[in-house]
Amino acid sequence: MSFLNIPAGRRFDLACLGRLAVDLYAQQVGSRLEDVASFAKYLGGSSANIAFGAARLGLRAAMVSRVGDEQMGRFLVETLQREGCDTTMVQVDPERLTALAILGLKDRDTFPLLFYRENCADMAIAADAIEEGFIADCRALLITGTHLSQPAVRAASTRALAHAGRHATLRVLDIDYRPVLWGLTKRGDGQTRFVPDARVTASLQEMLPQFDLLIGTEEEFAIAGGVPGDLLASLRRVREITHAAMVVKLGPLGCCLVAGAVPERLADAPTSAGERVEVLNVLGAGDAFAAGLLTGLLRGEDFASAARLANACGAIVVSRHACAPAMPTPAELAHWFGGRRGADVAADAQLAHLHRVTAPRARWDELNVMAFDHRSQFFELARAAGAPESRVPALKRLLVRAAERVEASRGLQGRMGVLVDDVYGEDALHAATGRGWWVGRPVELPGSRPLRFDGGPSLGTRLVQWPREQVVKCLVFYHPDDAVDLRLEQESRLREVWAATRDSGHELLLEIIPPRDTTDAAHADAAVLRAVQRLYTIGLKPEWWKLAPMQASGWTALAALVAARDPHCRGAVILGLNQPLDDLAKGFAAATHAIVKGFMVGRTLWAEPAREWLRGDVGDDAFIAAVATNFETLVDAWRASRPHAAASVPSPAPVHDTAQPALRPA
């Protein structure tokens, strides 16, 4: 870079020091904050948003801050870690609580904001805990303005800057002026973005010489320079104090660079035009801008390319509800710059799909799933055994224990899963959730054709109450040659499931079973493949397909279809249909293609032991042992069909798509 000296060959590209907080975003857009009924929880805080966004774009990012020793602090640390951001320097405070912000979206110009930061953890960063060796391992250090506003955090920032100066680490200030956090407004007025104040100006100017790059809006440079209403005069005052390069954010007009002397007109400075988009939420756009700008600069881009990337990141985020989770991925930016996006960002289905499937997510290279989400079958088992229906929930809790046993005996950590309903299996479902298993949960009314939803038609309302880790499983008896009215009705219901999961953030598994009365065995594979193709054609892109065993040629054809229609699909799993274990093993042997990730089998494993348990012929331990033995046999058959599957696989962890395209704007 001609205007910045950035070291190379270090462990981290960027460390961000500053606010790390929980954001609660109002879900009712257009509502007064007083009238908001529900909120969505996200990672927040300007520095944290930048670290998160930079990590998502592929930088080796790290966070320097402090959280409380409680659930919200752990949420923030885990969220950063899932994104690939280092949290070694995130201190844990045993006495203070994690910071909190509550945000509303009243209209395109009104975004009420409440900061709950009284004696919060991130304002108590211990300066002596910021290690010089850590800062020396960073190519750049970014600090946001709030952490210059109080003595304790100012001391921490000063210490980090001193370390950075000794090791030629690039020092960046995002001015991030929040008058309320400098005590200049009422505590409830977090929305006001500019209040002139000589004390703040003097405080900032004392620190400016310690930075190499300054990032700010027109108002933020006005407070830094101290000449309200005259941006050029403020920039000249800043230039008298520091040689730092200045990047001025101009909102929808883009940004400009002042690397040397301040020009007579701002238009004479190198400028990158902004993106025109419909604004939903301006909160966090500046953080997305900084993440994009620093990603470009740290990757050796010139200012024009880095600024174009920054402007795109900001434009995408202002069109979405959140800040950190709204940050784009490299795949989204490739789509953005590839000329394939629509004028309405919010309506760009492909951009939304890429955002969903290319952000880091839990990795499932293999799945060994016991399915006991059956409802009518368990009811019939109980009735045939003369047992009360009320015993079924206890039976399902025992199935979780059987799954636990097999996870341990076969080393299935990171490859274990269950399918459980919430009718008879609510307790079992709760027991399975939150332990690192793949957990699926059905929505279809058993046996319905045309498809109906169990629990009523308001699927979206139900999903709000589901843990995000649970996968929505929908079984449909579907054939592409069904009568037109039936096919269209079923496709309409499937679109509802698709739309509901896109809104809720849950993954979707579609289980496709062609009806036996219209599908002979010789054409079963073709019927399934045509069904999958048809559902792709109408716009559905589920994360998972659950299909009956096919010939090897069928799986090869499926892989080609998925690669063409949705290369980010997680893959397919084999269903059981109550087939004998030996028959399933033969099906596994034909399913060696990488598109097949595992199996989801139910009655084959537990039907006969359940019958005996419901009759009272065996006790809990014998039932668990019998089911576990069947499950182990099936796991062994799966491993025998693909020897590499027996290798140890780590627990699910976020995976970054290393095949994502480069970020360079076209």
Q: Residue spans of the language-model regions?
A:
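Alpha-helix-loop-beta-strand connector modules within alpha/beta enzyme cores
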Residues: 433-444, 490-509, 556-574, 625-640
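Conserved N-terminal subdomain of the carbohydrate kinase-like
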Residues: 60-145, 334-343
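Alpha/beta catalytic barrel-like cores
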Residues: 342-484, 582-598, 603, 607-666
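Conserved phosphate-binding/catalytic region of the ribokinase-like
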Residues: 1-14, 163, 226-349
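Conserved beta-alpha-beta core of the PfkB/ribokinase-like small-molecule kinase fold
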Residues: 140-237, 244, 252-261, 511-512, ...
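Glycine-rich phosphate/adenosyl-contacting loop at the front of the ribokinase-like
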Residues: 2-86, 109, 125, 278, ...
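Alpha/beta enzyme core
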Residues: 401, 405, 457-471, 479, ...
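Structural preference for beta-strand elements that scaffold enzyme active sites
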Residues: 140, 170-172, 213, 245-247, ...
